[in-house]
Amino acid sequence: MKKILLIFLLNTSMIFSQNIHVPIDTIVKTNHETIIKGEKIKYTAETGMQPVWDKDGNPIASLFYTYYKRNFSKDLDKKESHRPIIISFNGGPGSGSLWMHIGYTGPRVLKIDDEGFPIQPYGMKTNPYSILDTADIVFVCPVNTGYSRMIPDKNGDLPDRKKFFGINADIKYLATWINTFITRKNRWESPKYIIGESYGGTRVMGLSHELQNSQWMYLNGVILVSPADYKLLEFDDGQEDAIDSSLHLPYYAATAWYHKMLDKEIQSIDLLEFLPKVEEFTINELIPAIAKGGFISDIERNEIAEKYSYYSGLDKDFIIDYNLDIPNYAFWKELLRKRDGLTIGRLDSRYRGIDRTNAGSRPDTNIELNSWNHSFTPAINHYVRNELKFETDIKYNVFGPVHPWNKENDNTRKNLRKAMAQNPFLKVFIQSGYYDGATNYFQAKYTMWQVDPSGKMKDRFYFEGYRSGHMMYLRNEDLKKSNDDLREFIKNSSTNGMPAKY
């Protein structure tokens, strides 16, 4: 029988949304047990709403969170405050935390098949690979995602959206929220980690610096899952430069290999034997060729196009028509057009879709996102209400209204380097799926290379690739490996008995 404890910390303060009221400072606790890696684990799940305070101490928003804390027998000398804690964010911007919550590290996950495709009837199952045996986990929904909302003042006016919806505003208020959470839960002595998926990668790069310099909270690790680096993804004129454009090719090659669109010679070898050759070609030949623009010789253009075709499965003439610079949307439309009459997914290019016509320059829809939305959405709503016992009539925003999003002054990559330079203990782990076309794995490698141009901290960076897409943890083999990789990263970033110095 689950023990349920409901605590209303601020009974009179309410958050208002479409005439639906929920307490802004609430905790619901339920007790559970599960099996992780063959070991029985007892844990408490705490769901709730915790306010974001302004400088005058007034609540301006309340964030929905789920906090999983492992319980130990009294006869075991386990000090909770010394146990690692991981704070988890998804991306968007505007996405709730459901994806990694019920897809990756949490103790309960979505029912999916071994290759990571959701199966009906949709529901939840035990996650035997969850990192809860090693670390406590907090899943946080930023403002306007999940159940998180802005709070009106006494006059009924909502706060200025600029306080929340932008790269730097997002980092600033979330850092204050994390400080409040760590203080309330008495976790200042715990080794601390932040993990972010997709745009969450940008978020946690920035948080590493903000937490250290504004909240005096030093981290053991930053984990980037399929990270979105806006230095690569955003362009004033919509045109990529030679480097950014070229970084797509290794992903194109991996995807073409998966769909068996390459020569028999390549299809006969393993993906990980093949990709280093493509990466070398990209760095040493493709980038210099595209950098020459219209002044490249016809001979070199033809040679590069032939190699590009060999590695990507695209026709040489198609590549030449695009001036060796293939946009990712064109690749998703073109790769299977002639052979199968199908498109491929953006976030997970193992998915295939059917367009209204074979003609066109880009797919009609993101077929993989449609699949995920109609499987994750009912699962998270049912799980939170029926297993975690958090009840509200407010809508769970899988994707919430956060736009326009201020992308100015993005210094997150530089600030991660500063945070690492300030903190000799801080390590960074990057996880990417080879079939992710939105934030591809080679872009993630490039970001890793560029964070510290001096190379003096390169031994504190770790990278792992997985044979899946954006949510690389959906495939069962990768769910196991990626969680094990997180355990190893936590172990390797332990600093017990070590002085914080170079």
For each predicted feature, which ranges?
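N-terminal cap/lid subdomain of alpha/beta-hydrolase-fold enzymes
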Residues: 57-163, 449
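Catalytic histidine-centered segment of alpha/beta-hydrolase-like enzymes
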Residues: 467-478
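Short alpha-helix in the alpha/beta-hydrolase fold that links the catalytic acid
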Residues: 206, 426, 440-450
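Alpha/beta-hydrolase active-site loop
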Residues: 132, 142, 162-182
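A catalytic-pocket lid/entrance helix-loop region that shapes and gates access to the active site
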Residues: 107-111, 208, 212-307
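Catalytic-loop region of hydrolases
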Residues: 18-85
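Alpha/beta-hydrolase fold nucleophile elbow
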Residues: 187-199
